[in-house]
Amino acid sequence: MMKKMTGKSFALSALVAASFMAAGAMASDKTEPRNEVYKDKFANQYNSWHDTAKSEEITDALAGDPSLVILWAGYGFAKDYNAPRGHMYAVTDVRNTLRTGAPTNAEDGPMPMACWSCKSPDVPRLIEEQGEDGYFKGKWAKGGPEVVNTIGCSDCHEKGTPKLRISRPFAERGMEALGTPFDKASKKDKQSMVCGQCHVEYYFEKKDDRKGFVKFPWDSGTTVEQMEAYYDAIEFSDWTHSLSKTPMLKAQHPGYETWKMGVHGKNDVSCVDCHMPKVTNDKGRKYTDHKVGNPFDRFDETCATCHSQSKEFLEGITKERYAKVKELKARAEGQLVKAHFEAAKAWEVGATEAEMKPILTDIRHAQWRWDFAIASHGVAAHAPEEALRILGTAVDKAADARVKLAQLLAKKGVTDAVAIPDISTKAKAQAALGMDMDKMNAEKEAFKKDMLPKWDAEAKKREATYK
């Protein structure tokens, strides 16, 4: 039987508990998440990294291409999708997007904790403190007061040093699946692998013992066909399309994979060579520019170190490639949008699951390939031939689906063309899907007003205990 605690013993217990709580709040031994800690020791790198804040403009990708709303019907990207900005905005943008919803508490909202995984050095800190089981458990809102420092120093570097590291266990496992463990890689390979922690295709596992864990689908390789076969084998889907009822795959941003396929990757030209070149400060000292950006903005330090052609010549070639990719992208989207509406019509007139299965497989594969190509930001520069090849197969598979749909619809007595609603603007496309955008936007504004100040206050209090 427990003895009754005296006032003195109770006070001592409280003191011990408080000390443990304080210790638990300390920054990790391996990870210092606060980027500003390094602003003096690595001033040139810090200041250039901070310049990624100069990409203030928000580009609404759905407004620029309303077909995307239909292609992602039933998924968060149909609500909101902006072009990516600089690293300084990683936490801000994931907080503000409609995709993360408007949670009112730590257990609320549509998205899992895994949605923070590439946004902050607080992520490796949390994994080190809680283990992957603890980190990945729960909803996105659980991480709100914890994940507050944007992508920065400790994501790519060992604590307090320039030495490169992979800071996320799931990325380490991905590299090992390719037979290229980080600790045995060359310096050049490591310069791209640190980018490949996040600029990759990934998915959230659904197994009970690993539910919500991030995984790279590289067990069979990194081509679009190899990953497609992997997903099919495990019967994985990101969501079910609200029109066609297709079990869909959403490509993320497989920049690392497509870079490997292109001429630069094959010739050992790293991400850093083109996007973070060595530059000289006003004292004549060289350092790595951490304002990740377009190589043409620093042509002499990037392209000109290998190419003898002029900036105008190389820019012209790149623009031509972008134009060709954009043209084939639009053709694939046109076929896919029609396929989704035609599939919806087929269900409406009594199509069976057995009749629809081969059609939905074609739609699934076509859109996965289209998405893989367009979500690879920079693919027209990294691997234009591969982008065009993939988009060509997307067009073919979408066309195959539509031929099968035409035959099935005719069998069901539908011989006229299936009507497509007006989706000429983002608003019209969302209205065609019955999306209540006014309600979503109002809820998001309330979340930003009510929850974000609480998250920031809690984070500030916790970080005040750091040494």
Curated annotation (Swiss-Prot):
> Per the record's keyword annotation, is Transcription included, yes or no?
no
Q: What is its EC number?
A: 1.7.2.2
GO molecular function, a single term: heme binding
Q: What does the entry list as the binding residues for heme c 5?
A: 264, 303, 306-307
Which locations, inside or outside the cell, does it occupy?
A: Periplasm
Q: Which gene encodes it?
A: nrfA
Q: Which residues are listed for substrate binding in this entry?
A: 202, 253
Q: Which residues form the signal peptide?
A: 1-27
SUPFAM superfamilies documented for this protein: Multiheme cytochromes
Keyword Chaperone, does the record have it?
no
Which cofactors are named for this entry?
A: Ca(2+); heme c
Coarsely, its chief localization is periplasm
Cofactor annotation remark: Binds 1 Ca(2+) ion per monomer.
Query: What does the entry list as the binding residues for heme?
Result: 115, 118-119
Q: Where, in this chain's numbering, is Ca(2+) bound?
A: 201-202, 250, 252
Q: Which PROSITE patterns match?
A: MULTIHEME_CYTC
Binding-site positions, heme c 2: 153, 156-157, 290
- Sorted alphabetically, which InterPro entries does this protein's record hold? Cyt_c552 (IPR003321), Cyt_c_NO2Rdtase_formate-dep (IPR017570), Multihaem_cyt_sf (IPR036280)
Which parts of the sequence bind heme c 4?
271, 274-275, 382
| Catalytic activities | 6 Fe(III)-[cytochrome c] + NH4(+) + 2 H2O = 6 Fe(II)-[cytochrome c] + nitrite + 8 H(+)
Could you tell me what this protein is called?
Cytochrome c-552
Q: What is any Pfam family matched here? A: Cytochrom_C552
Q: Where does heme c 3 bind?
A: 87, 195, 198-199
Family from the record: Belongs to the cytochrome c-552 family.
Q: Tell me, what does this protein do in biology? A: Catalyzes the reduction of nitrite to ammonia, consuming six electrons in the process.
Query: Which pathway does the database say it acts in?
Result: Nitrogen metabolism; nitrate reduction (assimilation)
Provide one Gene Ontology cellular component: outer membrane-bounded periplasmic space
